[in-house]
Amino acid sequence: MLTLSDFDFDLPPELIAQTALPDRTASRLLAARHDAQGTHFDDRQFADLVDYLRPGDLLVFNDTRVIKARFFGHKASGGKIEVLVERLLDEHTVLAQIRSSKSPVAGSTLRLADAFDVTVGPRHEPFFTLRFPQPALELIEQYGRLPLPPYIEHTPDSFDETRYQTVYARTPGAVAAPTAGLHFDDALFARLDAMGVRRGFLTLHVGAGTFSPVRVENIAEHRMHSEWYAISPDLAEAIRATRAVGGRIVAVGTTSMRALESAAQPDGTLAAGSGETDIFITPGYRFRLVDALVTNFHLPKSTLLMLVSAFAGLETIRAAYRHAIAQRYRFFSYGDAMFLTRAEPDTQSASPDPSC
């Protein structure tokens, strides 16, 4: 039985990328390549992703847009608070985390950004409901701050407001970026279009739970956070058409992967619709839909590291991360990327070529 410690590794802190590169496709790409001799790792630039794709493949992107979900403010008593909006419930109401010396009570008001008051509603552990006096999204975008991940240590600036969004972000609602998509730009899309690689889009609003640590050693006891996703009939048809011509389904990011596998049917088709997913993918999971994955490097002991280990094989991921650390790749949200293909169930524990 795998435990939390099986997904731990030592990462030099200087390898945690603190800012994005000026050129999106200038990040590095670690591609895992398999042949009869084992697994090998290619050190490339992200623009070289085209060398690992084929005409007829379908790239599936998450088009969620990060909202300015963080606020600082105070209670009527003067006590300081920090608010992180987790989810938009309706035009005027949100779910939010509140950091305060004492939890606010229902019916009280909070002053946010020294600009407007919100009313505290019923609590839904671990969140509070907050009622905004005007359309919440408008006030969030006007007065909020971009919610950079906790391991990025600078105050967000105008550069972050551009680079912590994908170029195709269009559906507001996330509090963390689908970071594998940060590496794509219009020039790369033009090259992919020219070679016959297709694009599809879904929406999964990434919640702050993506950064929540796993607190139990027995990972089977972990309970995943829930996130909202939507899959269009157009994407479901694109999946069907791709399969019909022998193309591969390539998930861009773990959020796309989670949405696709949540909506995948036993026959390999995709069900259109929307809903909540708390899917927890760990080694032993049998993937129904996704053939390849573009992803960043993930935190030790994280559910996302478990997901990529389930997909590519635990030993492959361990070897890939050792290689990446030795080669000084940049890690986490603003870091470099990997290209992985799905391991067959009977090869997920196979050892990669030790010479890599």
Swiss-Prot record:
Keywords from the UniProt entry: Cytoplasm, Queuosine biosynthesis, S-adenosyl-L-methionine, Transferase
Pathway: tRNA modification; tRNA-queuosine biosynthesis
Leader peptide range in chain numbering: none
UniProt superkingdom: Bacteria
Principal subcellular localization: cytoplasm
One of the GO biological process terms: queuosine biosynthetic process
Catalytic activity: 7-aminomethyl-7-carbaguanosine(34) in tRNA + S-adenosyl-L-methionine = epoxyqueuosine(34) in tRNA + adenine + L-methionine + 2 H(+)
Record InterPro entries: QueA, QueA_dom1, QueA_dom2, QueA_sf
GO molecular function: S-adenosylmethionine:tRNA ribosyltransferase-isomerase activity
EC numbers on record: 2.4.99.17
PANTHER family hit by this protein: S-ADENOSYLMETHIONINE:TRNA RIBOSYLTRANSFERASE-ISOMERASE (PTHR30307:SF0)
Function: Transfers and isomerizes the ribose moiety from AdoMet to the 7-aminomethyl group of 7-deazaguanine (preQ1-tRNA) to give epoxyqueuosine (oQ-tRNA).
NCBIfam families, per database record: PRK00147.1, queA
Protein name from the UniProt record: S-adenosylmethionine:tRNA ribosyltransferase-isomerase
